[in-house]
């Protein structure tokens, strides 16, 4: 059994990417290669300098790492769809039986790949169906779980049934992560990242799409991915720091809801969740950026109104 470890990178922080590769170099399980998609437009001289930095490292893993760039592959550096395009590209390039998805700001312990493979074998055999192994995502070197969106016991957002190892795990793993997904290549290729849900919640949408293909989602508290996220202020974390972020956030709310939720959840979204989110984000804007809070709230309401009209008319545009 061989694993394709795939990762997207802006390729603008070589030390961060090197840290990620070092954590892979220490893996006990060795039958894998690494595909890194460089999400930027390299000139030939820039690419040469970039590659020299990694080739000069005394790491065995470099011999099993392939960097996809705009110069050596059909990758389009002028794409409009951010992470979704990059992730579809890297999944399409994976060659082996299993795929492990990472971001370049992740690190893992030496047993991570071995544990993922073992858990996949056990739970696929027990349930006799396709399954996806999902880790716990930790913020830097802390005990703060940073997984995305879902609470296991929150009906409003817990659309997928998360299959947990033990009932106590629901208190340890409150949410699941799009970082660190592991499964067979044939399973992960059953769905694609939605290139309209491009920058916010694209991992969540992808995992939900797998679930809708009758794939079981297994979350493990003992599978730990460390997320070395750059420093962000509160409004960047909420994705309302700029006009374009507010636009994409409002768009994704409606796209995601229309795509995945049932009628009961749709009513909860419109009458409970959406109003609460608007109030909460407006409060954040006033507290954390009082000089520009009015503009932020105006952006939110403007785009919520526009996406409501367009999506309900099935006229979603991509500009």
Residue ranges of predicted features:
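Short, flexible, basic/aromatic active-site loop/helix in glycosyltransferases
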Residues: 152-173
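Active-site donor/metal-binding and catalytic loop motifs
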Residues: 220-240, 253-256
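Short, acidic, metal-binding catalytic loop of nucleotide-sugar glycosyltransferases
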Residues: 22-31
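Non-catalytic, C-terminal membrane-associated alpha-helical segments of glycosyltransferases
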Residues: 243-252, 263-319
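A short, conserved alpha-helix in the catalytic core of glycosyltransferases
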Residues: 175-183, 187-191, 197-223
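Short aromatic/hydrophobic "clamp" motif used to bind/position activated sugar donors
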Residues: 99
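Conserved donor NDP-sugar-binding/catalytic core segment of glycosyltransferases
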Residues: 111-150
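Glycine-rich, basic loop-to-helix element that forms the pyrophosphate-binding segment
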Residues: 72-94
């Amino acid at each position: 059994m061989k694993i394709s470890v795939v990762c997207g990178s802006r390729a603008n922080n070589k030390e961060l990417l090197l840290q990620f590769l070092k954590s892979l170099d220490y893996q006990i399980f060795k039958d894998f290669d690494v595909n890194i998609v460089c999400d930027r437009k390299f000139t030939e001289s820039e690419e040469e300098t970039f590659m020299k930095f990694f080739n000069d490292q005394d790491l065995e893993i470099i011999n099993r790492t392939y960097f996809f760039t705009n110069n050596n592959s059909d990758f389009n550096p002028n794409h409009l769809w951010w992470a979704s395009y990059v992730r579809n590209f890297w999944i399409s390039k994976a060659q082996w039986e299993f795929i492990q998805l990472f971001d370049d700001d992740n690190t893992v312990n030496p047993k991570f790949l071995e544990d993922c493979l073992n858990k996949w074998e056990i739970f696929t055999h027990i349930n006799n169906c396709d399954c996806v192994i999902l880790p716990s995502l930790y913020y830097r070197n802390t005990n703060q779980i940073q997984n995305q969106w879902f609470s296991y016991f929150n009906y409003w957002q817990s659309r997928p049934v998360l299959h947990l190892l033990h009932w106590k795990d629901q208190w340890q793993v409150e949410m699941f992560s799009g970082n660190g997904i592991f499964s067979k290549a044939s399973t992960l290729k059953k769905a694609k990242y939605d290139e309209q849900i491009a920058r916010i919640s694209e991992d969540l949408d992808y995992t939900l799409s797998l679930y809708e293909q009758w794939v079981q989602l297994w979350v493990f508290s003992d599978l730990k991915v460390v997320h070395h996220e750059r420093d962000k202020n509160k409004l960047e974390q909420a994705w309302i720091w700029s006009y374009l972020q507010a636009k994409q956030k409002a768009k994704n709310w409606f796209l995601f809801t229309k795509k995945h939720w049932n009628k009961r959840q749709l009513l909860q979204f419109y009458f409970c969740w959406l109003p609460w989110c608007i109030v909460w984000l407006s409060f954040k804007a006033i507290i954390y950026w009082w000089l520009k809070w009015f503009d932020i709230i105006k952006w939110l309401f403007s785009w919520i109104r526009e996406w409501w009209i367009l999506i309900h008319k099935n006229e979603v545009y991509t500009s």
